Amino acid sequence: MINITAITTEHQLLKNIPIERVEQPDIAWYWVDFYGPEDTETALLRDFFHFHPLAIEDCFQHMQRPKLDHYDGYRFYVIHALNKETLETEEVDIFQGEKFVVTFHLHETPGIAKVRERLYASPDILKKGPGHISYMIMDQLVDEYFPLVYKIEDRLNEIEESRPHKTYGTLMNEVFDLRTDLLHLRRTIIPMRDLLYRILSLDHVKEQRETKAYFSDIYDHLLKLSEIVESNRDMTSDLRDSYVTLNSNRMNAIMMTLTIVSTIFIPLTFIAGVYGMNFDFMPELHWKYGYFAVLGLMAALVIGMLIWFVHKGWFNIFK
């Protein structure tokens, strides 16, 4: 599918015009958007626009890292959008010349449609030229990162609040799922941040105060997003470590309980074993108070060991 928007030298907005119309002398500049194009449409990149073969190849090689390449008469941007359902990265390619902007994306990208709607609602924006359209597309796609980042942050807070009511295994699975999502975000945001830094380093951007202000705004957004993502990754690490520590403490408490019980019953088992032997000549077996004496000895041993455990601080682990 191809959507073509153009503005005439008299600042008239033209929508959904045929590709041949953009060559007319009354066209000031135009925007051609290729969305899920067919073979005959993608051939226009080569036959109509005469873009460099390497740039055309990059359009079909998923996924290219966000970048900026300079060609004769135009710049080629590779930027990334995020699928709000799967957090998968989707590539958007921008060819920007003096009189045109050509966008290319294999999948539906709501951000592109929103930019087009803004242009239709405020045609005066088109007077700012094709460079401003490139800025608007980047700005829209980056702004759409924020709800995804905040959604993960909310999920992280929910996990923190529900920690006392969930099992260790459930919590760990949720934390690792969040870390995976944060990794996807980081792999998108950091390269985009590097791209914007490079754009701000261009001579023509440095010389144009308004253009620099626009792209600086996107760069600031990406800095904020990267800080939030890194902070959330640190929080998931802290949660993971606290869960591991908590589980280790629980295991230590269990092992201590078993150790105390075993330690208590070892001498009791020994005494019971001695007097359970079937010898005929054991003086205590025929003693009138032998049974009570053995029980008393066992009780004294239990009480003595418990006092010794308390003195050594063995029960502190249960506090």
Curated annotation (Swiss-Prot):
Name of the gene: yfjQ
SUPFAM superfamilies associated with the record: CorA soluble domain-like, Magnesium transport protein CorA, transmembrane region
Protein name as annotated: Putative metal ion transporter YfjQ
InterPro entries: CorA_cytoplasmic_dom, CorA_TM1_TM2, Mg/Co-transport_prot_CorA, MgTranspt_CorA/ZnTranspt_ZntB
GO molecular function, one term: magnesium ion binding
Membrane topology: Multi-pass membrane protein
Pfam families named among the record's database cross-references: CorA (PF01544)
Subcellular location as annotated: Cell membrane
PANTHER family linked to this entry: CORA FAMILY METAL ION TRANSPORTER (EUROFUNG)
Transmembrane spans: 254-274, 290-310
An example Gene Ontology CC term for this record: plasma membrane
Family: Belongs to the CorA metal ion transporter (MIT) (TC 1.A.35) family.
Domain of life from the UniProt record: Bacteria
Primary localization: membrane
Keywords: Cell membrane, Membrane, Transmembrane, Transmembrane helix, Transport
Gene3D superfamilies the UniProt entry points to: CorA soluble domain-like (3.30.460.20), Magnesium transport protein CorA, transmembrane region (1.20.58.340)
